[in-house]
Amino acid sequence: MNLENILPKDGPPLDEVTKYIEKYKNDLIVIKYGGNVLIDRNVFNNFITDLSVLNKLGLATVVIHGGGPRIKRELEKSNIQSKFIRGLRVTDKHIINIVESVLIDFNSDIVNSLKNKGTSAISLHTKRNNVIKTLSLIHI
């Protein structure tokens, strides 16, 4: 692997990068990407570039993303007021449809942007992968 062709010119020294590649080459790197960051397209594009570099370096990543600001905006468009208990959104059937739609949209944006950079990426979400099961809570 020719690191000079993968890494940004203004990036860290090659010996530093090599040390971390060796350290994490067999690990799964989990990245939490907040919904606030998704609002700024320049930050988003930088994030996609960084993920693409990690992929080209042979590092395995999983992105867990949010969508809070856009969820809030979509709920407001529908005149729906969210209720929060201890920082957690109380979600009924109508709200979950909006939340799910927003998150799947963000998910697709991330995956498609990575693929456009030549990076292998797959999407995992509730509509296609049955990754989440929920139960109604009577008391929190």
Map each language-model feature to its residues.
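Nucleotide/pyrophosphate-binding catalytic subdomain
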Residues: 1-138
